[in-house]
Swiss-Prot record:
<dbReference type="InterPro" id="IPR025777">
    <property type="entry name" value="GMPS_ATP_PPase_dom"/>
</dbReference>
<feature type="domain" description="Glutamine amidotransferase type-1">
    <location>
        <begin position="9"/>
        <end position="198"/>
    </location>
</feature>
<feature type="active site">
    <location>
        <position position="172"/>
    </location>
</feature>
<dbReference type="InterPro" id="IPR022955">
    <property type="entry name" value="GMP_synthase"/>
</dbReference>
<comment type="pathway">
    <text>Purine metabolism; GMP biosynthesis; GMP from XMP (L-Gln route): step 1/1.</text>
</comment>
<keyword id="KW-0332">GMP biosynthesis</keyword>
<dbReference type="Pfam" id="PF00958">
    <property type="entry name" value="GMP_synt_C"/>
</dbReference>
<dbReference type="InterPro" id="IPR014729">
    <property type="entry name" value="Rossmann-like_a/b/a_fold"/>
</dbReference>
<dbReference type="GO" id="GO:0003921">
    <property type="term" value="F:GMP synthase activity"/>
</dbReference>
<dbReference type="InterPro" id="IPR029062">
    <property type="entry name" value="Class_I_gatase-like"/>
</dbReference>
<protein>
    <recommendedName>
        <fullName>GMP synthase [glutamine-hydrolyzing]</fullName>
        <ecNumber>6.3.5.2</ecNumber>
    </recommendedName>
</protein>
<dbReference type="InterPro" id="IPR004739">
    <property type="entry name" value="GMP_synth_GATase"/>
</dbReference>
<dbReference type="GO" id="GO:0005829">
    <property type="term" value="C:cytosol"/>
</dbReference>
<comment type="subunit">
    <text>Homodimer.</text>
</comment>
<comment type="function">
    <text>Catalyzes the synthesis of GMP from XMP.</text>
</comment>
<feature type="active site" description="Nucleophile">
    <location>
        <position position="86"/>
    </location>
</feature>
<keyword id="KW-0547">Nucleotide-binding</keyword>
Amino acid sequence: MEMAFEQELILVLDFGSQYNQLITRRIREMGVYSELHDHEISIEEIKKMNPKGIILSGGPNSVYEEGSFTVDPEIFNLGVPVMGICYGMQLMTKLLGGSVERANEREYGKAVIKAETHSLFTKLPEEQTVWMSHSDKVINLPEGFNVIAHSPSCKYAAIENPERNLYGVQFHPEVRHSEYGNDLLRNFIREICKCTGEWTMENFIEIEIEKIREKVGDRKVICAMSGGVDSSVVAVLIHKAIGDQLTCIFVDHGLLRKGEGDMVMKQFGEGFNMNIIRVDAKERFMSKLAGVSDPEQKRKIIGNEFVYLFDEEAAKLKDADFLAQGTLYTDIIESGTKTAQTIKSHHNVGGLPEDMQFELIEPVNTLFKDEVRALGIELGIPEHLVWRQPFPGPGLGIRVLGEITEEKLEIVRESDAILREVIAEEGLERDIWQYFTVLPDIRSVGVMGDYRTYDYTVGVRAVTSIDGMTSDFARIDWEVLQKVSSRIVNEVDHVNRVVYDITSKPPSTIEWE
């Protein structure tokens, strides 16, 4: 099973493009496993991975600049199909003897190309719209390369060396603005790399179970359960692999949603017969967070306290060597890599103290959110649990903006419960990717009855998305929003105003902190 899995790998090398994980995502949608790795990966490591094909991502650098990202040229001699996208195509050109220089004008946005209807463009229209995003251009092709697509402003929109199975495109096929981008990627993966497209959650489970058993042996694992979908799926997966060697520690840090703690104990402790220890740490977390308003500092404090608490619990349990987390692919990219600026430290990535005594197990850190949900269904977790709203590790701590107090937490907890109730009543749970309330650290004047009020404003955030990498605000019917607003103002103490966030990602993130 492991060998078959490795043979069906498409390796994506990261040169810093904002779209690099979308490449991986699109490939997986075709039933082929794909991983994103740093461009500095060695040839020996690549050989061990035995990929069926390699994609060089785009990136913000210019290939002729000193210190720009590069790759070992030996990658083109492995006998494996390689496709470069934008910067990846320019890098391939330069390393193989062609030339690249700055374009007179930066090309950004939609463009119409004219393509040869073979190779990457097999069974595709001769003319098609693509998404360009580049400020450099190829001037001369390396020996053995041909032009297979061009546009009025881009002489080399796509190139190939069929004898060596090397390809390049000066646009982004992974972006949905490229109308036949998925088809082009499919041609590369299926026709050129000869992948069969048999990657499923079923074989992912088999492989991960074997990995977990091999890594853990007869030792013990502690799983950090936050009450969210990610950690719950991880707990069930690891329990399936090693059974009673797993102990889940559910930290009730006082930052949970309404009814969260009891639900976790009932559904997973009783429902899946898992060993779960519930730790009441409300006072501990609140004392550490007292007076803290900076969001990064709050994340670090919450992350550190989690792990310090696990150290203490592990000492009681004895022989716990591993800490399991529900880290996702998107968590890693948003916490920054060698090629990406840190957007915000993630609770499962940037909040861990350096002296942590555990080895990490992160079995879903190569999956996107919708893949984790599919994994949960395959593991037998009921749909109503799998489709629960995503909940960050720091919990309501990052949905109360500024300093955290018990009063503010109660406002967010109650308003969020109302929002979820209304969305469920309207049958919109599956139509909206994520929805929650936040409490900005502002008050405003209002009138309730015959009296002037000066109370808090609650923000409602609801977005649509496919994989969490990008999102747009949900177009919820005004009558539904009015119902949400009316109930929150009338049922939640100290609130006199409700606002709706109509910002997409980017430029914003989904969470406010």
